[in-house]
């Protein structure tokens, strides 16, 4: 309970201090001392002056005299000036030249500084004095006054009987020391002393006869001091300063800190929260409205309203309106102008309408050219099926990609550009914009969209729909944001924590997806470009097969097709390359290369491998033949517990990459073997008839097809030349 009471007291004091810092003195604070007004940030008691600086604490004595330190206060200005009276300095001598009196002024101004409105003045004959000041830096100056009679010219302080020089601003310590050249013996009768003092410019008028004798018995002179709040600039304090409402902050010209002033049209104390009040110019004769106009006060300003029959001119005066004849011509001119503007506006609206109609017709034209009617007909005629193809609009695609902005590009290849798209429901998709190709490919494209949209496999990238209202069709599919298997094995996302268990699971998932495409899809699909760069991984490292731009649909009554060779070097089936005959065993070969990459951690085609062929398949076979199998396996995956599993996986990879397609297993057999290997239950083994030396020789005999590294040579759909190809890729 005591802790809570203590916290409450602290909070109350904090709020009180915050209000005080923001310029809220207590209501009972003294506002006058004698005939001098005391205005915040000045005050005469705690809680009444600005708490950040004791220099604002003034003293009002019992005689109602206001003091700044020991200096009487004349008045204060909220614009940053304080006028005080400062004692003069003097040194006096008798007729024999002996010093009889010496007063040297030494004054500290606290955080206030001298204003440049002051003048350093010396009065006397054969006299001189020094002014020494300090602040941010030190400053010294002096003044000399020479004369030999009291007939010196009055009103002039040019060095004859009186010397006066400017004083720089910004100094908070003042020391004045008067001196004499010869101690005044020759001028003692009319000038026994040297006087030196600071005085506000224009507040001292030299009279030779009186001033040389005794300075008219004046002992103090008005001096102007500059004051400001704190030691920071307006920019540094931002909104934490003390300036109230309807005021503005400006940096002090007399030193550090800042001052406040009311905005134009307001007056009052800018250091109080509501100190600046609106000036009613209409009752204070501060307006310039003419005799025919009526003044209307507004916040911070005023308006001059003209009576009926008058108008306001450029001089803010009210003059009679123009004659009816001239006004009639003005009306004609305005009517013509307005009519012309309406006609131009109508023409502009008509042009916009025509443009909109043309755009609509163009989108419809593209929709028909890209097979929109065919797609709608086939989807509507599919009956109860799992065909779910969403047709997106051209406007929706443009908004999703921010106008196909380059910052949304995920990747570019030979078959088109992939953009990251954000749909209205904030779901993220990948949008493939193909390169312009042959319009005769439309039926093949529509067929591919229909087939791929029916694929519902967790390890195959899902096609969501397409857009046919653009010059080239767009394909929309799910977005995978964790990179490709290639990136994790060799590239920017290389992950040393990609364990054997991860790699075996990825291989099993890819094999399962390919087996599904080959054997379980409504129409068998051969991917034709299986590689680590086309296998995407999500945040859980789940594999997703992507990029169906090179895929082929295999009719149910055929086992293979004759096609133009297409694929990626290092993964390309040698038999397919040599014969042009495409079947599901081509995907098996490519998968075998991927499995070797998972085992070895090496690229499918590398020209920097020492003591080993550049092709990974040949390198794998060579290492196996020469009993260097352990050297080619990635050291991060092999340990004493998994050597047998890795050897089994290597055997599967070797069987998948046999030279002759008929000797390779089918993908569903590969998937079953890997699944069995993964769960360590039953292992299905294939025939050993191809594991002899002859197979190794065949593998070693595979020629490297090109020296272009991992460049993909994509020609398009094989049955039609020079056509648009659409990759089904995810974000990469």
UniProtKB/Swiss-Prot annotation:
Query: Which SUPFAM superfamilies does UniProt cross-reference here?
Result: EGF/Laminin (SSF57196), Protein kinase-like (PK-like) (SSF56112)
Q: Where is the EGF-like domain?
A: 230-277, 278-319
Database matches in Pfam families: EGF_CA, GUB_WAK_bind, PK_Tyr_Ser-Thr
Q: List the disulfide bonds.
A: 234-249, 243-260, 262-276, 282-295, 289-304, 306-318
**Catalyzed chemical reaction(s):** L-seryl-[protein] + ATP = O-phospho-L-seryl-[protein] + ADP + H(+); L-threonyl-[protein] + ATP = O-phospho-L-threonyl-[protein] + ADP + H(+)
Which tissues and organs express this gene's product? Predominantly expressed in green tissues such as stems and leaves. Detected at organ junctions.
Give TM segment ranges. Answer: 330-350
UniProt keywords, alphabetically: ATP-binding, Calcium, Disulfide bond, EGF-like domain, Glycoprotein, Kinase, Membrane, Nucleotide-binding, Phosphoprotein, Repeat, Serine/threonine-protein kinase, Signal, Transferase, Transmembrane, Transmembrane helix
Catalytic machinery residues: 529 (proton acceptor)
CDD domains found in the cross-reference section: EGF_CA (cd00054), STKc_IRAK (cd14066)
| Biological process per Gene Ontology, one example term | oligosaccharide metabolic process
Its main subcellular localisation, reduced to a broad class, is membrane
Q: Protein kinase domain spans which residues?
A: 404-677
Q: What is the protein named?
A: Wall-associated receptor kinase 2
Q: Which gene encodes it?
A: WAK2
């Amino acid at each position: 309970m005591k802790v809570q009471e203590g916290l409450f007291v602290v909070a109350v004091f904090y709020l009180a201090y915050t209000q005080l810092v923001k310029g809220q003195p207590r209501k009972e604070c003294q506002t006058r001392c004698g005939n001098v007004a005391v205005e915040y940030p000045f005050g005469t008691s705690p809680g009444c002056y600005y708490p950040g600086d004791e220099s604002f604490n003034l003293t009002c004595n019992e005689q109602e005299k206001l003091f700044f330190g020991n200096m009487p206060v004349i008045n204060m200005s909220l614009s940053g000036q304080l006028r005080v009276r400062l004692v003069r300095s003097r040194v006096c001598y008798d007729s024999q030249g002996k010093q009889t009196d010496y007063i040297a002024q030494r004054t500290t101004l606290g955080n206030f500084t001298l204003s440049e409105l002051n003048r350093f003045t010396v009065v006397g004959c054969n006299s001189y004095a020094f002014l020494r000041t300090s602040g941010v830096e030190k400053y010294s100056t002096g003044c000399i006054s020479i004369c030999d009679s009291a007939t010196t010219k009055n009103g002039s302080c040019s060095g004859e009987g009186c010397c006066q020089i400017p004083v720089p601003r910004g100094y908070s310590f003042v020391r004045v020391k008067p001196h004499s050249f010869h101690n005044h013996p020759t001028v003692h009768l009319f000038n026994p002393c040297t006087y030196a003092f600071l005085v506000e410019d224009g507040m001292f008028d030299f009279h030779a006869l009186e001033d040389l004798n005794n300075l008219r018995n004046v002992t103090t002179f008005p001096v102007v001091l500059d004051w400001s709040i704190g030691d920071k600039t307006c920019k540094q304090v931002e909104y934490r300063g003390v300036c109230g409402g309807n005021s503005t902050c400006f940096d002090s010209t007399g030193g550090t800190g800042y001052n406040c002033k009311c905005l134009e049209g307001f007056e009052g104390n800018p250091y109080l929260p509501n100190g600046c009040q609106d000036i009613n110019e209409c009752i204070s004769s501060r307006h310039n409205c003419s005799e025919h106009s009526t003044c209307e006060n507004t916040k911070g300003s005023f308006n001059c309203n003209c009576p009926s029959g008058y108008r306001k001119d450029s001089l803010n005066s009210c003059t009679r309106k123009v004659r009816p004849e001239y006004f009639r011509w003005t009306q004609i001119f305005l009517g013509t102008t307005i009519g012309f503007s309406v006609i131009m506006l109508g023409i502009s609206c008509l042009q916009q309408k025509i443009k909109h109609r043309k755009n609509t017709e163009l989108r419809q034209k593209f929709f028909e050219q890209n097979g929109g009617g065919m797609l709608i007909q086939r989807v509507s005629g599919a009956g109860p099926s799992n065909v779910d193809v969403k047709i997106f609009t051209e406007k929706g695609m443009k908004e999703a990609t921010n106008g196909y902005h380059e910052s949304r590009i995920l990747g570019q290849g030979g078959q088109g550009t992939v953009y990251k798209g954000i749909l209205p429901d904030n779901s993220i998709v990948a949008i493939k914009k193909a390169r312009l190709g042959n319009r005769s490919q439309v039926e093949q494209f529509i067929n591919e969209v229909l087939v791929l949209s029916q694929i519902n496999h967790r390890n195959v990238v899902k096609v969501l729909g397409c857009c046919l209202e653009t010059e080239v069709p767009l394909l929309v599919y799910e977005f995978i944001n964790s990179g490709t298997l290639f990136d994790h094995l060799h590239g920017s996302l290389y992950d040393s924590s990609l364990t054997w268990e991860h790699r075996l699971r990825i291989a099993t998932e890819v094999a399962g997806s390919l087996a599904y495409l080959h054997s379980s899809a409504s129409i068998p699909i051969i991917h034709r470009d299986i590689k680590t760069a086309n296998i995407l991984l999500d945040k859980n490292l789940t594999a997703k097969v992507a990029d169906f731009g090179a895929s082929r649909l295999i009719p149910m009554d055929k086992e293979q097709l004759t096609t133009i060779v297409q694929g990626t070097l290092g993964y390309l089936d040698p038999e397919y390359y040599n014969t042009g005959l495409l079947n599901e065993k081509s995907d098996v070969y490519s998968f075998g290369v991927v499995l070797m990459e998972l085992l070895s951690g090496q690229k499918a085609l590398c020209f920097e491998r020492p003591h080993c062929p550049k092709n990974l398949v040949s390198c794998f076979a060579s290492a196996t033949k020469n009993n260097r199998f352990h050297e080619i396996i990635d050291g991060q995956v092999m340990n004493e517990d998994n050597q047998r599993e890795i050897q089994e996986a290597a055997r599967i990879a070797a069987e998948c990459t046999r030279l002759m397609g008929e000797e390779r297993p089918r993908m569903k057999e590969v998937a079953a073997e890997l699944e069995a290997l993964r769960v360590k239950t039953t292992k299905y083994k294939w025939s050993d008839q191809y594991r002899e030396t002859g197979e190794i020789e065949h593998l070693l005999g595979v020629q490297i097809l090109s020296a272009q590294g991992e460049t993909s040579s994509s020609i398009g759909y094989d049955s039609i030349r020079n056509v648009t190809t659409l990759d089904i890729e995810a974000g990469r």
